[in-house]
Amino acid sequence: MKIKEFMSNKKGASGIGTLIVFIAMVLVAAVAASVLINTSGFLQQKASTTGKESTEQVASGLQISQVMGMHNNSNINKTAIYISPNAGSSAIDLSQAVIMLSDGSNKRVYKYNESSYKDLTNGGDIFDNANVEWIKATATKFGIVVIQDADESCTAANPVINKGDLVAITLNTTSFSTTPRTSITGTVQPEFGAPGIISFTTPATYLNDSKVVQLQ
């Protein structure tokens, strides 16, 4: 009788122990599942953000439609680079852009000068010597001439360009040796996205009756 009672108690204790182990396993599995779900959610959000940034990086950038120059019979002393955002590009803040230009012997880095800004959306002569973008031009600062800007996003203090905008970057290139047949290379590098590529060779001769020439 005592043996049967002992065996019954032993089975009861064993059943309780098994139940405790089972509950512990369920709790551990629940915690593990919660951690996995949270980690999965974080990784998904991170991947989505990274993918969006990568898409913006690839799609965004600048394109150069043409480069015009004005010469003084021996060198190109004024250069205007016409730029617009790439198709599908995010808005680009030109105050953060950097322009690098080289003639093979010299290299110049230009940054934006807020005082060298001109709005010509109603028309005008970009190469007019009286324009502030040339008066304030230096060997290290570039100016901006706004040609097309429907939403008026490109201002002197915040020169941001977006879809449909067209501006000219103005450079004082007097410090370069841009004599005839000189190769010029460079980039207009925005804060993010693809740069605009500058690559041209100056004309074989500079004619008095044609002060403004197309370079690229």
From Swiss-Prot:
Regions that span the bilayer: none
Keyword annotations: Archaeal flagellum, Glycoprotein
Gene name per UniProt: flaB2
Glycan-linked positions: N38, N72, N77, N113, N172, N208
Superkingdom of this protein's organism: Archaea
Record keyword Protein transport present: no
A Pfam family matched in the record: Arch_flagellin
Cleaved propeptide residues: 1-12
Family, as annotated: Belongs to the archaeal flagellin family.
Organism: Methanococcus voltae
A GO term, aspect molecular function: structural molecule activity
One cellular component term from this protein's GO annotations in UniProt: archaeal-type flagellum
UniProt protein name: Flagellin B2
Location of this chain's protein in the cell: Archaeal flagellum
Claim: Glycoprotein is one of the keywords in the record: yes
Signal peptide bounds: none
Primary subcellular site in the record, as a coarse category: other
PTM text: N-linked glycans consist of the 779 Da trisaccharide beta-ManNAc(Thr)-(1-4)-beta-GlcNAc3NAcA-(1-3)-beta-GlcNAc.
GO annotation terms (biological process): archaeal or bacterial-type flagellum-dependent cell motility
Job description of the protein: Flagellin is the subunit protein which polymerizes to form the filaments of archaeal flagella.
Entries under InterPro entries matching the protein: Flagellin/pilin_N_arc, Flagellin_arc
